[in-house]
Amino acid sequence: MEFILSLIGSLLLIICVLVSVAFLTLLERKVLGYIQIRKGPNKVGLMGIPQPFCDAIKLFTKEQTYPLLSNYLSYYISPIFSLFLSLFVWMCMPFFVKLYSFNLGGLFFLCCTSLGVYTVMIAGWSSNSNYALLGGLRAVAQTISYEVSLALIGFKILLFSLL
């Protein structure tokens, strides 16, 4: 019974995160509309609230294309795995009710975010294009350098909170 409740809580958390990201992009589009002195996405429904759902429908109905010489399976699995990792990181965040109790939640966060490097590398490699491979390797180097500084800042905060 506890497993079913944690599964329902996890699914509810994932749905809430995805919907909140959709509405944050709506907020971003509205702010950009005001900054650029043009009409933002206020025309659909009441204050543009149905706009994220229309965008989701548009994204799911787009035609799926892939490069001719690419590795088909890894080309499509790597972005899905990246999305899965970014949603999996939310499981260790302490909310009103903890879904999963981790003693080493910070280490789990660093491990999950560092796995995202492999998805970028596999996505660049699987397209069988030299330019995509070089772009993927540049993104890997940049991500690793940012993760080192993130880990050092996190350990510094942890160290000063214990003193």
UniProtKB/Swiss-Prot annotation:
GO terms classed as biological process: aerobic respiration
**What are the GO cellular component annotations?**
mitochondrial inner membrane
Return the InterPro entries for the record. Answer: NADH_UbQ_OxRdtase_su1/FPO (IPR001694), NADH_UbQ_OxRdtase_su1_CS (IPR018086)
The cellular location(s) given in this protein's UniProt record come to: Mitochondrion inner membrane
How does this chain sit within the bilayer?
Multi-pass membrane protein
Which keywords describe this protein according to UniProt?
Electron transport, Membrane, Mitochondrion, Mitochondrion inner membrane, NAD, Respiratory chain, Translocase, Transmembrane, Transmembrane helix, Transport, Ubiquinone
Q: Name the top EC class.
A: translocase
Report the transmembrane regions from the record. 3-23, 77-97, 104-124, 143-163
Record EC number = 7.1.1.2
One Pfam family it belongs to: NADHdh
- Disulfide connectivity for this sequence is none
Transmembrane as UniProt keyword: yes
Q: Which top-level group of life is the source organism from?
A: Eukaryota
Recorded GO terms, molecular function?
Answer: NADH dehydrogenase (ubiquinone) activity
- The answer to whether the entry has keyword Translocase is yes
Question: What's the catalysed reaction?
Answer: a ubiquinone + NADH + 5 H(+)(in) = a ubiquinol + NAD(+) + 4 H(+)(out)
Q: What family is this?
A: Belongs to the complex I subunit 1 family.
Question: What function does this protein fulfil?
Answer: Core subunit of the mitochondrial membrane respiratory chain NADH dehydrogenase (Complex I) that is believed to belong to the minimal assembly required for catalysis. Complex I functions in the transfer of electrons from NADH to the respiratory chain. The immediate electron acceptor for the enzyme is believed to be ubiquinone.
Q: By what name is this protein known?
A: NADH-ubiquinone oxidoreductase chain 1
Q: Which organism is it from?
A: Drosophila miranda (Fruit fly)
